[in-house]
UniProtKB/Swiss-Prot annotation:
The keyword Transmembrane helix does not apply. This is mRNA cap guanine-N(7) methyltransferase. It is found in: Nucleus. Residues 44-57 have a biased composition (Basic and acidic residues). It catalyses: a 5'-end (5'-triphosphoguanosine)-ribonucleoside in mRNA + S-adenosyl-L-methionine = a 5'-end (N(7)-methyl 5'-triphosphoguanosine)-ribonucleoside in mRNA + S-adenosyl-L-homocysteine. It comes from the Eukaryota. The lineage of its organism: Eukaryota, Metazoa, Ecdysozoa, Arthropoda, Hexapoda. It comes from Drosophila melanogaster. mRNA-capping methyltransferase that methylates the N7 position of the added guanosine to the 5'-cap structure of mRNAs. Binds RNA containing 5'-terminal GpppC. Residues 1-79 are annotated as: Disordered. The record marks K146, K152, R177, H229, E314, Y403 as: mRNA cap binding. Its main location: nucleus. Belongs to the class I-like SAM-binding methyltransferase superfamily. mRNA cap 0 methyltransferase family. The gene is Rnmt. Residues 103-411 form the mRNA cap 0 methyltransferase domain. One of its GO terms (molecular function) is RNA binding.
Length: 427
């Protein structure tokens, strides 16, 4: 059995499942964003949509995925775990900097934050290059949490921000942080002042546009950081989430996200043993609640534990399915990179920011000799054993490299005689 979960894009079983659930009228686009598959080496993915709707979280029959008029009713049928996720994030305590510095994953959190900064900067730069002078710059921070990216939006000189999250407590904390930024900006004539709106709701169940102060507004960028995977509880929820990401994006606008890499998760699960349901290290662990052979396209539920954080149920994101859902709403895949690859791509021009954000731990040579977590540093240092090296511990790196970044572009469209959009994809 292959360890490469990615290659299912052109697998016959995967194609049958997609046709059965009618994800899109555009069957020609299937798998174009992915590499060629080797069907005889793939993990078994359920052929029948009925199988994976019977998995945890899946209750829909798949017949209404193309119905764009009633997403809330469709999505609600598969939302068995949304209240668990909301409770999890509402219960998280807001730790101070001193408490965070004591954590085993202090540097990993900073590293992840740097990844987000690089991703946001990459696509905000492209937007600014193409927009006209004086045009508004509007952003949706979908699943905004406590507002960890507010300073990034301020530095990006945006005009308006929409923040939404499933956890009411998080949205309240986010709004307070925004007010603090506003108060600080009053003291500086150079500070960027941007307007914002906040509301709590589940983006996998609710059409966000109907909650905006101006439902007709057009967005330049939609960002969903470390949260998109929750929508893969069911197809209807994933469809609703992708619609929310794409619906108000201007043509040429971007949807960017970070999420767990299902292919890497499955690779590590297989490496743990033929009957393994759990793997991890000192700072993280993953334990599957569903059958892993065959793997369902939706409802592939696992429990994720991170050091110092309450366990929370999550779902694998089958990436070819994500790409196909995106195309349904006019989103074309531009980028898919693992955190490891994205780090390499951005290190040269992002090194200074990485240092400022304490994204790597400075490790002295003598520590490497006695600490297994930093044994890899000795190999890197070579002859220069007197110099300290910036790195992550082995356990932190293993946790960080469970994730990927991705970016989509909203395509222009015309309309057919039935009033359906015909998107102009580049491929």
């Amino acid at each position: 059995m292959s360890l490469n979960y990615e290659q299912n894009a052109a697998d016959e079983q995967f194609a049958r499942a997609h046709k059965a659930v009618s994800l899109s009228d555009d069957e020609e686009s299937e798998g174009q964003a992915e590499t060629t598959s080797a069907p005889n080496q793939e993990p078994h993915v359920s052929k029948s949509p009925r199988e994976y709707y019977d998995e945890p979280g899946g209750k829909g029959n798949g017949s209404g995925a193309d119905d764009q008029d009633e997403p809330e009713t469709e999505a609600a049928s598969g939302a068995a775990n949304t209240h668990v996720v909301a409770h999890h994030y509402n219960e998280l305590k807001e730790a101070g900097r001193k408490d965070r510095q004591k954590s085993k994953i202090f540097f990993m959190r900073n590293f992840n934050n740097w990844i987000k900064s690089q991703l946001i900067n990459e696509y905000m730069s492209q937007i600014k290059q193409n927009k006209r002078m004086g045009d508004a710059l509007r952003v949706l921070d979908m699943c905004c949490g406590k507002g960890g990216d507010l300073l990034k939006w301020e530095k990006a000189a945006i005009s308006h921000l929409i923040c939404t999250d499933i956890a009411e407590v998080s949205v309240e904390q986010c709004q307070r942080r925004y007010q603090d930024i506003l108060q600080r900006s009053e003291k500086s004539k150079f500070a960027n002042k941007f307007t914002a709106e906040f509301f709590a709701c589940d983006s996998t169940l609710v059409r966000l546009r109907e909650r905006y102060k101006d439902p007709s507004l057009q967005l330049n960028l939609v960002s969903c950081q470390f949260a998109f995977h929750y929508c893969f509880e069911s197809m209807a929820q994933a469809d609703c989430m992708m619609r929310n990401a794409a619906e108000c994006l201007k043509p040429g606008g971007f949807f960017i996200a970070t999420m767990p890499d299902a292919y890497e998760i499955i690779r590590r699960l297989r490496a743990a043993g033929p009957d393994a349901r759990r793997f991890g290290n000192d700072v993280y662990s993953i334990e599957f609640d569903c059958e892993t052979d065959p793997l369902p396209l939706f409802g592939a539920k696992y429990q994720f534990h991170l050091e110092g954080v309450v366990d929370c149920p999550e779902f694998l994101v089958h990436f070819p399915t994500l790409v196909k859902l995106g195309r349904k709403y006019g989103l074309q895949l531009l980028k898919r990179s693992t955190f490891a690859d994205y780090y390499k791509e951005n290190l040269h021009h992002g090194r200074h920011l990485l240092q400022r954000m304490s994204g790597l731990e400075s490790v002295q040579p003598q520590r490497c000799e006695n600490d297994e977590e930093f044994a890899h540093v000795s190999n890197f240092q070579g002859a220069q054993r007197s110099r300290s090296v910036g790195t992550l511990s082995k356990s932190e790196w293993e946790a960080a490299t469970l994730y990927l970044v991705c970016a989509f572009k909203k395509c222009k469209n015309t309309w057919d005689t039935n009033g359906k959009p015909l998107f102009e994809f580049d491929d």
